Amino acid sequence: MEAINKTIDHFDPSRTNQASKNITLIGHSMGGVLTRLLVSDSGNTIINALEQKYPQASDKINQMDPKFKSILRFKPLQGVTTAIFLAAPHQGTPYADASWARYLASFVKLPLSIVNKLGEMTLMIFGQDLPREINMTGVDNLSAKDPTIRVLAKLPISRNVTYYSIIGRENADGPLEESSDGIVPYWSSHLEGAASEKVIVSGHSVQETPEAIIELRKILRNQLVDQSSSKHTKALMAN
């Protein structure tokens, strides 16, 4: 979020350009989870979860909160009006627990700046390194059993953001609720309140299918039409 804000501040410091007011975020798989965080309001949910999990560290958590505000308490990214999620495991995936996934996770490393910040934060809270159950790879945190993904799934999406879901299912047969794209189950990708939900017979790489591309174009085209109509209405009212 910080990087996006810095980019916008550089090219549009006054944030008066139309592109700064009608941002569309599109995220696939874990990118979809990150996209959701960018349009969510954490409130005190993350802090409360930490205090509930580690009551003995409650005072230290409150003491370090101001310094790590961007991690523990954040608001939706300013200017975003639309979010599109493709095969996003909002509630995790059981496949993250598989041995092959954990093997691949050993090669996944967070950026050094984030690792340093998290390391400093946990030292302040626990006076030692990260507790064993707190993992440092995105793959681990996508497990449906992971407490992190469970907390993040509870964060409310901004009312100012219209969001859409594009979901894959490997097989057209059987109940939709029991389907999966081979990696992410339908129940994890499904989001209540979505403006639309497009389910496509596809594997996890649903973003590569013609149906998904057509759906993306339709959403973006309709968004432009809506913005144009809104401008026209405002112009008429002004006259």
PLM feature segments, named:
Residues 1-135, 181:
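Serine-dependent carboxylesterase/thioesterase catalytic core
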Residues 100-108, 113-239:
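C-terminal catalytic-base region of ester-bond hydrolases, centering on the histidine
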